[in-house]
């Protein structure tokens, strides 16, 4: 796995803004602004996170990668892992972009599927071009 040692451009997908980001903003009004800035700054320098327990590589197929990033909301006194807050992101080394596809608390996802099955379903059906780049139409991770 190779992540460029540069500052990436970080964006929230429209899907993440419409579906989950609003919940964080509403629930953590004052804390969220600081948290969002911290997330962007962390992911901007994602190469620094690659050897930590906060960033899990789901799939890497050069020059692309799909990662899960754990984060905590400022002022909650919870560790990023234990907070249950997650980001699923797409890294494009060629374009030097990090696209936040999903931002959620694990309890936000539908209960009839496991957490992994739920986000896989959302990525596959809402970001088909990204899915194809990483999996060539296969369901395997």
Residue spans for each PLM region:
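Arg/Lys-rich, positively charged N-terminal/basic patches that mediate binding to nucleic acids
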Residues: 1-44, 129-141
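A general structural signal for short secondary-structure junctions and capping/turn motifs
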Residues: 2, 58-60, 91
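Enriched for short, Lys/Arg-rich terminal
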Residues: 4, 74, 78-141
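Alpha-helical interaction segments
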Residues: 10, 22, 57, 108-109, ...
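Short alpha-helix boundary/capping elements
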Residues: 43, 47, 93-96
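A short, surface-exposed loop/turn module that caps and links secondary-structure elements
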Residues: 45-77
């Amino acid at each position: 796995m190779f992540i460029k040692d540069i500052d990436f451009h970080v964006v929230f997908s429209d899907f993440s803004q419409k579906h989950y980001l609003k919940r964080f903003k509403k629930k953590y009004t004052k804390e969220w602004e600081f948290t969002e800035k911290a997330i962007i700054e962390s992911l901007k320098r994602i190469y620094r996170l690659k050897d930590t327990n906060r960033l899990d590589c789901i799939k890497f197929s050069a020059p692309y990668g799909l990662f899960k990033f754990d984060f905590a909301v400022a002022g909650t006194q919870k560790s990023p892992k234990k907070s249950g807050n997650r980001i699923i992101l797409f890294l494009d080394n060629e374009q030097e972009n990090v696209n936040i596809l999903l931002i959620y608390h694990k309890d936000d996802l539908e209960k009839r599927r496991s957490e992994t099955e739920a986000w896989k379903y959302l990525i596959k059906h809402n970001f088909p071009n990204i899915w194809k780049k990483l999996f060539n139409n296969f369901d395997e991770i």
